[in-house]
A protein has these predicted regions:
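Class I SAM-dependent methyltransferase SAM/SAH-binding core
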Residues: 51, 59-104
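A short glycine-rich, Lys/Arg-flanked "PGG" loop and its adjoining helix->strand segment in the class I
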Residues: 129-144
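A conserved beta-strand element that flanks and buttresses the S-adenosyl-L-methionine
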Residues: 117
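Short catalytic micro-motifs in class I SAM-dependent methyltransferases
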Residues: 120-121
Length: 255
């Protein structure tokens, strides 16, 4: 049974390391490619009001701003938000930047958004289900929630492949202290049940359904273009979606 952490984890002290680790190589490129491909399929061809909850360094927001959408980035960690501001300035794009945790967003946002992004946030929260009603209020009735989260199933599978059987017996999956392993990996079935009161899941994809399981020497030899092509081609395959290190669910709010 998962023991909840005492507080949400913010990235003030880890911003630079986090950025380099996630976005410095193939892992980050695959993540962005899958999220962007999924969103391209559903978003209407008009400017949208977008809220990025836990926006981090703003990679996804910048992509959306570049497509003409009106973007608000909400991020509690000042170094991350500063990095996002610099990224937008370098690109010559405008956005609204809000330094606030998710608990304060309803008080700071006057009306709901056409698209709410919540990517790699839930797994760092002390009580992940608590954010769901807030996300529902922030999403317009005909809008979309783009929810990406760290998949507990994939973490278990990776530990099986590595022979970490003692860790599996103790169910010690969470990262601790300064670890960049999330403190609360999510069980997709449990989350689906919690989500049901607030959203219906319309589309599901796996993010990195095979890359992270490749032997290191094969990862090093593979061309990024080939990795992206194959990850995109297999992200919704029924045998592979659930192996994604992250799962991306596109959701509509329940009435």
């Amino acid at each position: 049974m998962h023991q909840p952490a005492h507080h949400d984890r913010h990235f003030d002290e880890l911003a630079t390391r986090f950025a380099e680790k996630i976005y410095g190589g193939a892992k980050g490129a695959i993540r962005l490619a899958v999220l962007q491909a999924d969103l391209k399929e559903v978003l209407p061809a008009r400017p949208l009001r977008v809220l990025d909850v836990g926006a981090g360094l703003g990679h996804m927001s910048l992509w959306l701003a570049g497509h003409g959408h009106q973007v608000t980035l909400a991020e509690p960690a000042a170094p991350m938000l500063d990095g996002a501001r610099a990224r937008f300035a370098d690109a010559g794009c405008e956005a609204t930047f809000v330094q606030a945790p998710w608990q304060e967003l309803l008080g700071q946002c006057s009306e709901p958004f056409d698209l709410v992004l919540c990517h790699a946030v839930l797994e760092w929260l002390a009580e992940p289900p608590a954010i769901l009603p807030v996300l529902h209020q922030l999403t317009a009735p005909d809008g979309w929630l783009s929810l990406a989260f760290y998949n507990r199933d994939a973490l278990i599978y990776r530990n099986l492949l590595k022979g970490h059987f003692r860790k599996l017996r103790k169910e010690r999956f969470a990262g601790e202290g300064q670890s960049l392993t999330p403190q609360c990996p999510l069980d997709p079935r449990e989350l689906a049940g919690q989500l049901d009161d607030w959203f219906r899941v319309e589309q599901q994809s796996g993010v990195r359904v095979f890359h992270d399981y490749m032997p290191v020497e094969f990862q090093a030899r593979a061309e990024l273009t080939d990795l992206l092509e194959m990850e995109l081609a297999h992200r919704r395959h029924p045998a592979f979606t659930g192996l994604g290190r992250y799962l991306h669910w596109l959701c509509r709010p329940q009435p």
